[in-house]
């Protein structure tokens, strides 16, 4: 879908519907739900195009706007995807009414088994915990043999996505705010911010090598420094990066030239902290601690200049009486873009 406007929300997104699980990740108001609703046909963009596979289902200029029922997209959103007065089995049988009785019964039994719901077939939706209810909703949706599955619910978990991968080979677009679950369960990651697609690609590749500052911020690379490439050493596989307050040794930057302006990023959990009197090493920066925030398992340390580190509570207990601090930005943990 590209360049769509829905009410006051503007979407400038070119997002391919490809087989496998694509996670849509971004802050509230980024356009994740609006994207799915436009694809499904529940909202009508003022302009733009929507394609499902090779089929154009919406084109504002050409006057094409297929109704939702003809797009063959299964959409699971805030509304319950199950009939509350029916059991799980009855819900699936209702969705499978295109087949003859014996074939329908067989297909429903197979789908219940795939989603590990055989013990819940006579239960009603209200009697299921949220995550199992969502499994039943997905199973019912797949009985209609959709071309694509759109999931806009926060109850999706690793078990559901694993079962879904074995039950459906087509495109899945899944809205989530769980970055760890994206990493473990999605094939691709689409990063949305302000109605724009700011990053897209295989999950691990995009998490390790974000394409922009906006993408880096979304995937929790909180330490970001504008820098100038002051040197390139292919023999040592290194670069020299001049930031505003310090100079860093980074990875060799193939395709870049000396003098190029870049951004350097590092996750807070990859920053190491040392006592001020320790002999400095590579990428050690003397820093002043300005804020400490205790969390359930970690402590977040924020230093003058904006660098933040996330360390274990045990490590902080050993170092809390430091008279001075040095932060270490390991070269292997730096991301340059």
Regions found by a protein language model. Give the residues of each.
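Hydrophobic anchor residue at the start of the ABC signature
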Residues: 138
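ABC-type ATPase nucleotide-binding domains, specifically the catalytic core motifs of the NBD
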Residues: 86, 90-106, 114
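Conserved ABC ATPase signature
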Residues: 124-132
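Internal alpha/beta loop-helix hairpins
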Residues: 176-246
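Conserved ABC ATPase "signature" region
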Residues: 58, 103-120
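ABC ATPase NBD coupling module
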Residues: 57-74, 98, 206, 210
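Non-catalytic connector elements of ABC transporters
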Residues: 2-34, 38-51, 55-56, 232-337
